[in-house]
Amino acid sequence: MQTLALIAAFGVVSLGLTILGMGGVAPIFSHPPLMALAVVVCLLLVASTFTSGNLSSGEREDRGNRWVLAVFGVLQLMVAYLPAYTDRIGFWTIDGDSIRWLGVVLFAAGGVLRMWPVFVLGRRFSGLVAIQPGHALVTDGIYGIIRNPSYLGFIINTLGWGLAFRSMVGVILAALHIPPIVARIRAEEAMLRMQFDGEFDRYSDRTYRLIPGLY
């Protein structure tokens, strides 16, 4: 419940910043792509209430990586406000509703990819870099292709949000998520390698870290 309350509180604050950036609710409903974006946001929020992710330190945690959460928080608040604001004032925007629709599609696809692993892992999915009780290495399904699908979904989701508001600032903000995500992945994989030893090494040898075929 604590995790759900935090998600809800952050969601409310982010929604408020987006509305503030757009100058009210009316401008959002004047653009069909943004109306579709609002529907997708609502669907993803509802879906998140059925997840079992947590913020537990579990049996062992790398507390030195908690700074990444603070960076994510600041970046996400900027993502909530700046793309909407630059869209409203026409600063560094990309012309055309087609880019908005592309953004909506990417936002939805990224959101699904972000949330899918949370459902797969259940209570083993933590917002912290930690080993949970009964932790097991999942190597099938989407994890048989890439080791960090949720983070790839996070990047795609954030990029889609920026494009839905035609915002180049939003695109840059999405790119700024990559360094802390890579730092987070390295910390997580170091812990998994310590926990599962040769099993994780064999798994990492046959899969990509984040982007199939590239990285």
Located regions from the model:
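Membrane-anchoring alpha-helices and their flanking helix-loop junctions
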Residues: 1-132, 160-215
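Active-site-proximal inter-transmembrane loops
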Residues: 128-153
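PRPP/pyrophosphate-binding module of the type I phosphoribosyltransferase fold
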Residues: 155-157
